Structure formats: structure tokens, C-alpha cells
Amino acid sequence: MLDFGELLPLQPPTIPAHQLPPAALAYFGDAVYELFIRLLFLTPPQRINAYHRQVVAHVRAESQARYMDFLWEYCTETERSIFRQGRNAAADGPKRVAAKIYRQATGFEALLGYLYLTNPQRLQEIFQLLAGHIRSEVENKTHAAESPSEM
């Protein structure tokens, strides 16, 4: 099992997270999340194009919103509040994504940015939950693709 705390060794800035606007937390959380996903799919070794396809599939707003739905039951009230602040601060997203989905993804990113800055151990726990969930999704999708279709 990957220890994401060791893989994300950067020291957070000394700016208290509560002084950052939710959009800034989301901006930062987006980078933290993409690094997590890239690390998650780094093994087994594969071609760069395959890495890219996997990462893009999981950093899309639709995936982030789905993962936030999964995490909701594990979130504390403070974490839910940070999510709501990020969701409510979301600007208009790309036209290809429904506004509700984009706002949920922004809230998800704000939560990850907040946790990175305030509680790296909790972020590690969230990433472990997500890693298990994502691997399960990928495995189920792989098995479904390998199963012969019934006609």
C-alpha cells in the first residue's frame, strides 16, 4: 500500500488555511489531487499515453464529484463545511460539464487543499480510502470488459 504522506513531502506554506479563499484552496487541491492520481497509476509501468488516459479519466470533474459522494459518509462536519464553501465559491465551469457537477468537483478540490494545509495525516486517510475505491472501480471495469457479452 502506498504511503501518500511520504510521496507528498512538500511542506505547506505558513499561511493559515482559514485565511485562503475557497477558490484558492480548490486551485491548490486540484494540484494535490492530480499528483495523488498520477502516483496511484504509476505502477505497473506502461506507455505514457496509457498513463495519461488513466489520469485524465480520474481527474475529470465527473469523477471528482463521484468520489466526493463516496467520501461524504467519512467526512467530519468541518470537512463537509469546507466542501460546501468550495462548492458555493465555484465559478462557471466548462460547458461540457453540468454546473452542479463542476461545483461538487470544486468543493472536493477545496477539501483536499484544506486538508493538505491543515491536516496531512487526515489527507493520507482520505487518499487511502480513495485509492481503495478507485482500484475497486478499475478492477470492476476491467472484469466487465473481459466478460463475454451475452447475446
UniProtKB/Swiss-Prot annotation:
> What Enzyme Commission number(s) does the record list for this chain?
3.1.26.-
Q: What is this protein called?
A: Mini-ribonuclease 3
List GO molecular-function terms, semicolon-separated.
Answer: ribonuclease III activity; rRNA binding
Give the quaternary structure: Homodimer.
The record's top EC class is hydrolase
Q: What does this protein do?
A: Involved in correct processing of both the 5' and 3' ends of 23S rRNA precursor. Processes 30S rRNA precursor transcript even in absence of ribonuclease 3 (Rnc); Rnc processes 30S rRNA into smaller rRNA precursors.
Signal peptide residue numbers: none
Tell me which family the UniProt entry assigns to this protein.
Belongs to the MrnC RNase family.
Gene that encodes it: mrnC
Q: Where in the cell is it found?
A: Cytoplasm
HAMAP family associated with the record: RNase_Mini_III (MF_01468)
